[in-house]
Regions:
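Surface-exposed beta-strand-to-loop junctions
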Residues: 9-13, 84-86, 130, 166
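Glycine-rich P-loop/Walker A and Walker A-like loops and their local beta1-loop-alpha1 context
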Residues: 1-38, 94-98, 274
Length: 323
């Protein structure tokens, strides 16, 4: 169980009325909540969306209305003997309504004495100032190495595909920075083409990463074939790069050697700053991400904060990388 699972369980046990899980991975959020309800038995999970209404409740699949106000009335009346976690999908679209806003604020008080929690799942939402103090925010990071390894192993096992340990390790590392849905997409493509997942899929993973990063409109995945030999001068930097490359080895990790944090390059245009970044990425065999700061802070209020958060999260998930 991860630290994130521990945080979620703690918030639910503490009877936190409304939790906003910041994530675009709706299916993954629902799976994590299902696992949480198993750990926190006898709690049950109910989900709501505007098309299906309330569903996923044991023996009560047709309860509840499609209307957003009705589902809030429903959770308010659920008996304490049936502790419930209610996942509201796309609910942020309705939170500008004064009635919905008032009802949510009322529920933050009502649910403190009840064993129920409301979960709102959304990646991009700028909550009203009136609701800001009543929300508990829980950021869901992209899948970590252990989750990716388990996911790939399960997919291979389900398809009777043999996955060698060294190949699994390489694919796990390559898939860091991808959402669970995108990892499944790469695996499904591999199984359709060759009937198994293998080392050949590393190229597919890199292409999926490029598409994932391109979607952010802020990060760009850069290809590079430059090396330190293409850079004139800067011998001190080149020596440092050669020496510090060893910090990423297993021996250095076991020894406790800290990873290099960054390099500050200062100079006018045309002096090779971007070239050096490309050379570092190629020399250290790491992905190179280009961040467009102008786009990062352009657009609507609230959107730039969400983009910054997503950008940092994506870069951290792809670590080690050159940004």
């Amino acid at each position: 169980m991860s630290n994130w699972d521990d945080q979620l369980d703690l918030l639910i046990r503490a009877r936190t009325p409304i939790i906003w899980i910041r994530s675009n991975e709706e299916e993954r959020v629902e799976t994590l909540l299902k696992n949480s309800t198993k750990r926190l038995s006898p709690r049950r999970l109910a989900t709501w969306d505007y098309i299906n209404g309330i569903s996923n409740i044991l023996n009560s699949n047709n309860l509840g209305s499609r209307q957003p106000m009705a589902v809030l009335e429903w959770i308010k009346k659920v008996d304490n003997s049936s502790p419930t976690i209610l996942l509201l999908k796309d609910f942020h679209h309705f939170c500008e309504d004064p009635g919905i806003l008032r009802m949510l604020k009322n529920l933050t008080i009502t649910l403190r004495s009840k064993p129920h929690s409301i979960i709102i799942s959304s990646g991009l939402w700028n909550p009203s100032n009136d609701l800001e103090e009543d929300l508990t925010i829980l950021d869901l990071p992209l899948p970590i190495e252990a989750e990716i390894k388990t996911l790939l192993s399960n997919i291979a096992e389900a398809s009777n595909s043999k996955l060698e340990e060294n190949v699994l390790k390489e694919l796990t590392s390559a898939c860091s920075g991808l959402s669970e849905a995108r990892i499944r997409k790469v695996a499904a493509r591999a199984l359709s083409q060759r009937g198994q997942i293998g080392k050949e899929d590393l190229i597919e993973v890199l292409e999926e990463k490029r598409q994932s990063i391109a979607r952010s409109e802020v990060l760009e995945y850069c290809k590079t074939n430059k090396s330190p030999n293409d850079v004139g001068g800067l011998q001190i930097l080149k020596d440092w790069l050669k020496q510090r490359k060893q910090a990423f080895s297993e021996e250095a990790k076991d020894f406790g050697l800290p990873l290099p944090k960054g390099v500050l390059l200062v100079g006018p245009q045309g002096t090779g700053k971007s070239l050096v970044a490309k050379a570092i990425a190629n020399s250290w065999s790491m992905p190179l991400l280009r961040l467009d700061v102008g786009r990062l802070f352009a657009g609507l209020v609230g959107a730039s904060e969400a983009r910054t958060r997503e950008t940092i999260q994506r870069a951290e998930a792809m670590a080690p990388c050159i940004l």
